[in-house]
Amino acid sequence: MKVNVDMNSGFCFGVQFAIDRVEDEMKASGPLYSLGDIVHNAVEVERLEKLGLKTITIEEFKTLKNTRVFIRAHGEPPSTYKLALENNIELIDATCPVVMKLQQRIKEFYDRGYQVLIYGREGHPEVIGLCGQCNNEAIVLKHADLSDRGETEKIDFSRKTVLFSQTTKDTTGFYELKANLENVFREHHAAQNFDSAATESIVPDFQAKDTICRQVSNRDQKLAAFSKENECVIFVAGRKSSNGKVLFEVCKDANSNTHFIENQSELERAWFLRPDDSLVESVGVCGATSTPMWVMQQVAEHIRATFAAERFVQS
C-alpha cells in the first residue's frame, strides 16, 4: 500500500506568516497572548502553547492592560484596536493581507451607503472582523439557495447592495448565491414597477464581489485530482476550520472513500480495506489551509507503520 502526501496542501501564506511571526515574537520577548486560536487546528495550537502562547477570549482581552497581544490572520473589528489603545495594549498584528484588503473594501462600500451582504458563517472570527467594518450592520448569508427566511427577511431589496464573501468560502456556493440574489432583486423590481417605461435608474444597484482567497479556490481542482488518483483519501483538518469543511467536500465529491480526521488517533482500519478484505493500493493524505504539513506527514507515517505493514495484511 502506497501512502502519498499532497504537497499542495498545508498552510496558506496568511496562516504561515502568522505562525512564523508569533514564533519569532516569542523567541525574542517570551510568552505572548493570542486573541482567539491562532489557527483552527487543535494540534498546532497545542504545539504553540507549549512554546509560550496563551490563547484568550475577547472577554479576557477586555480585562488586560499594559501587555502584548497577538492578532491572528482572521483579523479583528475596529473595536478591538480601540480597546487596545485605551488599555495600553501593544498589538502584534498578523491579519492576512487578503482579509485586510477585504475589510477596507467593505468599509468603503458601507460609507457610500451600500447595504452589505456577506457570504459566510455567522460568528466566524473573520466574519466578526468584517462585520465590524460596517458597524455590525452587514447581513451574513450562509445558505446559497436562500432557503433560510431568517437570513433573507433582513435584506432590503430596494436598497443598493453589495455582496462579498468570507475569504475561505467555496466559489460554487458564492456564484449560486449571486445568481439567486440577482433573480430576487430583479423580481422585486418588476413587482414594484409596472410601468414598462420605467427608467433603468430605478433598478436597485446590486453588485457581487468575489473575495474568496485564490489560494483557497485554486486548491479545489488540485485536491479533486489528487483524490481521484488515490483509492482512499485521509483529509486532515481542525473541526473548527471553515476551509477544512469546504475542501473536505471537494475531496469527498471526487472520491467517496474520503475520511475526515483531526489527528492520527482517529484513523480506522476498515478505511484501508476493500470489500474482499485486501488492502487498498494507495492512500492520499491531504488537508486544509490551516493544517500544518508536519501533521499530515505524521499521519502518513502512522498509516505506513500501522496499516501498511505486512503484519496488518496477515492479521
From Swiss-Prot:
Cofactor note: Binds 1 [4Fe-4S] cluster per subunit.
Binding site residues for isopentenyl diphosphate: 40, 74, 124, 241-243, 290
Obligatory cofactor(s): [4Fe-4S] cluster
Enzyme Commission number(s) from the entry: 1.17.7.4
Amino acids binding (2E)-4-hydroxy-3-methylbut-2-enyl diphosphate: 40, 74, 124, 167, 241-243, 290
Residues binding dimethylallyl diphosphate: 40, 74, 124, 241-243, 290
Keywords: 4Fe-4S, Iron, Iron-sulfur, Isoprene biosynthesis, Metal-binding, Oxidoreductase
GO molecular function: 4 iron, 4 sulfur cluster binding; 4-hydroxy-3-methylbut-2-enyl diphosphate reductase activity; metal ion binding
GO biological process, one term: isopentenyl diphosphate biosynthetic process, methylerythritol 4-phosphate pathway
Pfam families: LYTB
Keyword Lyase listed: no
Transmembrane segments: none
Top enzyme category: oxidoreductase
Keyword 4Fe-4S applies: yes
Residue positions binding [4Fe-4S] cluster: 12, 96, 213
Catalytic residues identified in the record: 126
Pathway: Isoprenoid biosynthesis; dimethylallyl diphosphate biosynthesis; dimethylallyl diphosphate from (2E)-4-hydroxy-3-methylbutenyl diphosphate: step 1/1; Isoprenoid biosynthesis; isopentenyl diphosphate biosynthesis via DXP pathway; isopentenyl diphosphate from 1-deoxy-D-xylulose 5-phosphate: step 6/6
Catalytically driven reaction(s): isopentenyl diphosphate + 2 oxidized [2Fe-2S]-[ferredoxin] + H2O = (2E)-4-hydroxy-3-methylbut-2-enyl diphosphate + 2 reduced [2Fe-2S]-[ferredoxin] + 2 H(+); dimethylallyl diphosphate + 2 oxidized [2Fe-2S]-[ferredoxin] + H2O = (2E)-4-hydroxy-3-methylbut-2-enyl diphosphate + 2 reduced [2Fe-2S]-[ferredoxin] + 2 H(+)
Cited HAMAP family: IspH
Function according to Swiss-Prot or TrEMBL: Catalyzes the conversion of 1-hydroxy-2-methyl-2-(E)-butenyl 4-diphosphate (HMBPP) into a mixture of isopentenyl diphosphate (IPP) and dimethylallyl diphosphate (DMAPP). Acts in the terminal step of the DOXP/MEP pathway for isoprenoid precursor biosynthesis.
Family: Belongs to the IspH family.
Name of protein: 4-hydroxy-3-methylbut-2-enyl diphosphate reductase
Organism: Chloroherpeton thalassium (strain ATCC 35110 / GB-78)
Record lineage: Bacteria, Pseudomonadati, Chlorobiota, Chlorobiia, Chlorobiales
Name of the gene encoding the protein in the UniProt record: ispH
